[in-house]
């Protein structure tokens, strides 16, 4: 089995690429970072530091790499069995044109073996969005062939992979936590789904997408925003602060009540899942910077993301949301001179009031109780 993985960054190398290579898949990375590409091609191998109670170094072997904008991409997509991505939601549209050219070539070559594409991004139904970009770039005469032979498989992914230490001299070295979860929608594959240890199949993906978004992502973001306000540098420092921890746990319990109503999760099992995530935030071996985790606050405050979406769920089911409201308020107060969205957010707040800014970003109703509650919480935190 052959695979092409877009994104040779930390998540690509430390999570999805590693699972594919460990499964014996012949793996090629695609990226734009020439230093990483050169190192992968020179060595064909790289170390992954898996950190937890039993820290270990695992070696990934038998990989190579190509530049994302090269014609190699077209030839590879024409022949591989799987394409995966870990590039960031905003980059999917950029890689769609090369994918479309590869799919056209695959059709021209009469290669009727199934091709399955899986976007492994922090977003809801990311592969479905990628498919829309690919269809836009693909001449219409190929659309029917694509529908017959190419599967676009949505997934939910979860593994904390912080950036490499600044003093690391190895461009391929990556550190990951022990925990990982990759869940894919088995109903969307063309042909038989591949057997890849660490990739779980489900026919109820949205339950797992929202479980992860409403718990790991919600908790991670709120820990970062409250942590920054409290002067903490890392997620571990933030979660060890009793005041921060109480709000983070409370927010995950509020979003969890939505999940239990919506998907019928067992309350005791979900409570254990929340505790597992808090334990992951406490991991002393992960240096997870609050400024990094808090980046892109405009995206994180949008209607379909980790703060507003669970809050909308609490309104739908008439459930409490005090801690989620505090988390939204903390997000509005996030400041980072190195993040364009944080700068834009600060600019919006300098020109207009909190309620107008929140409504503009999130789509919430300006006259709603929840917007009034966020304004009150911002004033209390500021």
UniProtKB/Swiss-Prot annotation:
Binding, NAD(+): 3-14
EC number: 1.1.1.17
Gene3D superfamilies per the UniProt record, alphabetical: N-(1-d-carboxylethyl)-l-norvaline Dehydrogenase, domain 2, NAD(P)-binding Rossmann-like Domain
Catalytic function, reaction form: D-mannitol 1-phosphate + NAD(+) = beta-D-fructose 6-phosphate + NADH + H(+)
Keywords: NAD, Oxidoreductase
InterPro entries: 6-PGluconate_DH-like_C_sf (IPR008927), 6PGD_dom2 (IPR013328), Mannitol_1_phos_5_DH (IPR023028), Mannitol_DH (IPR000669), Mannitol_DH_C (IPR013118), Mannitol_DH_CS (IPR023027), Mannitol_DH_N (IPR013131), NAD(P)-bd_dom_sf (IPR036291)
GO cellular component: cytosol
Protein's GO biological process: mannitol catabolic process
Record has Oxidoreductase as a keyword: yes
UniProt keyword annotation of Oxidoreductase present: yes
Gene Ontology MF terms in the entry: mannitol-1-phosphate 5-dehydrogenase activity
EC supergroup of this enzyme: oxidoreductase
Family membership noted in the UniProt record: Belongs to the mannitol dehydrogenase family.
Matches recorded under NCBIfam families: PRK02318.1-2 (NF002646), PRK02318.1-3 (NF002647), PRK02318.2-2 (NF002650), PRK02318.2-5 (NF002652)
Protein name from the UniProt record: Mannitol-1-phosphate 5-dehydrogenase
Organism of provenance: Erwinia tasmaniensis (strain DSM 17950 / CFBP 7177 / CIP 109463 / NCPPB 4357 / Et1/99)
């Amino acid at each position: 089995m052959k695979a092409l993985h877009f994104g040779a960054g930390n998540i690509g190398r430390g999570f999805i690429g590693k699972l594919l290579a460990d499964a014996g898949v012949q793996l090629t990375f695609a990226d734009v970072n020439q230093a990483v590409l050169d190192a992968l091609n020179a060595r064909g191998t790289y170390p992954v530091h898996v950190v937890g109670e039993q820290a270990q170094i695992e070696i990934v072997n038998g990989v190579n790499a190509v530049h994302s904008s090269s014609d190699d991409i077209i030839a590879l997509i024409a022949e591989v069995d799987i394409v995966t991505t870990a590039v960031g939601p905003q980059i999917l549209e950029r890689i769609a044109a090369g994918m479309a050219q590869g799919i056209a070539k695959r059709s021209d070559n009469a290669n009727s073996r199934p091709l399955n594409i899986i976007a492994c991004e922090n977003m809801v139904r990311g592969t479905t969005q990628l498919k829309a970009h690919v269809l836009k770039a693909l001449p219409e005469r190929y659309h029917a062939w694509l529908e017959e032979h190419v599967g676009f498989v949505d997934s939910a992914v979860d593994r904390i992979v912080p950036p490499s230490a600044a003093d690391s001299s190895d461009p391929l070295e990556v550190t990951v936590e022990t925990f990982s979860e990759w869940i894919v929608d088995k109903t969307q594959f063309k042909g038989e789904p591949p057997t890849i240890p660490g990739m779980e199949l489900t026919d109820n993906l949205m339950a797992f997408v929202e479980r992860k978004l409403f718990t790991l992502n919600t908790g991670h973001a709120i820990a970062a925003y409250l942590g920054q306000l409290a002067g903490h540098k890392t997620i571990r420092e933030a979660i060890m602060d009793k005041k921060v921890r109480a709000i983070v746990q409370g927010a995950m319990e509020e979003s969890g009540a939505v999940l239990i109503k919506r998907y019928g999760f067992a309350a005791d099992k979900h409570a254990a899942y929340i505790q597992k995530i808090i334990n992951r935030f406490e991991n002393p071996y992960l240096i997870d910077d609050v400024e990094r985790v808090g980046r892109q606050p405009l995206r994180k405050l949008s209607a379909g993301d980790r703060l507003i979406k669970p809050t909308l769920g609490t309104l739908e089911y008439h459930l409490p949301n005090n801690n989620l409201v505090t988390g939204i308020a903390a997000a509005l107060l996030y400041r980072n001179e190195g993040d364009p969205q944080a700068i834009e957010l600060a600019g919006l707040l300098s020109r207009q009031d909190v309620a107008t800014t929140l409504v503009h970003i999130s789509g919430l109703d300006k006259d709603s109780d929840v917007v009034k509650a966020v304004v009150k919480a911002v004033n209390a935190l500021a």
